[in-house]
Amino acid sequence: MRKAEVKRKTKETDIYAELNIDGKGNYDIATGIGFFDHMLSLFAKHGLFDLKVVAKGDLEVDTHHTVEDVGIVLGNAFLKAAGDKKSIKRFSTFYVPMDEALVRVSVDISGRSFLYCDLPLKAERVGNFETENVEEFLRAFAYNFGITLHVELLHGGNSHHIIEATFKALGRALDEALRIDERAEGIPSTKGIL
């Protein structure tokens, strides 16, 4: 099984995560940010990852440090759990609708860190979560996992719906890209390395 445990402690945050890529979608999330907990729960459930995240951060300042650092920790956890990446499917694109919102997420488990994010969000906050932190989370996650990640809003207006569709689509896309293809042998690259 592809599993990882990652801890990260700074003067701003203290974060612990457990991940099982080949899970059932079980989750235990406690970041102190209700809406973010909900999004990470959706991510795990729809990606079929078993995920535990416990985060303590300087929420008296704002949610930025906690959200970004959870992205760093989860990126590292996925990198560690993915191992040598032999026989993975590598690529995936997933569309998720949430009422009027439609989001497309494309993933390449490439070893090359890149984020393209086009998510215009009208609301500055959803609950106590600053919506600009969606992109901060995605960037930290992509760069620490070493993946190319494209996230685009195709249409929609409700910020909650857009963000929810994003986290669900990310979970689904990663589930597909990390799946083992029994037909494939070795690393899915002509270079022989990812």
From Swiss-Prot:
Catalytic activity: D-erythro-1-(imidazol-4-yl)glycerol 3-phosphate = 3-(imidazol-4-yl)-2-oxopropyl phosphate + H2O
GO cellular component annotations of the record: cytoplasm
Enzyme Commission number(s): 4.2.1.19
Subcellular location: Cytoplasm
Record's protein name: Imidazoleglycerol-phosphate dehydratase
Keyword Zinc among UniProt keywords: no
Leading EC class: lyase
Family matches, as Gene3D superfamilies: Imidazole glycerol phosphate dehydratase, domain 1
The encoding gene: hisB
HAMAP family: HisB
Pathway info: Amino-acid biosynthesis; L-histidine biosynthesis; L-histidine from 5-phospho-alpha-D-ribose 1-diphosphate: step 6/9
InterPro entries in alphabetical order: IGPD_sf (IPR038494), ImidazoleglycerolP_deHydtase (IPR000807), ImidazoleglycerP_deHydtase_CS (IPR020565), Ribosomal_Su5_D2-typ_SF (IPR020568)
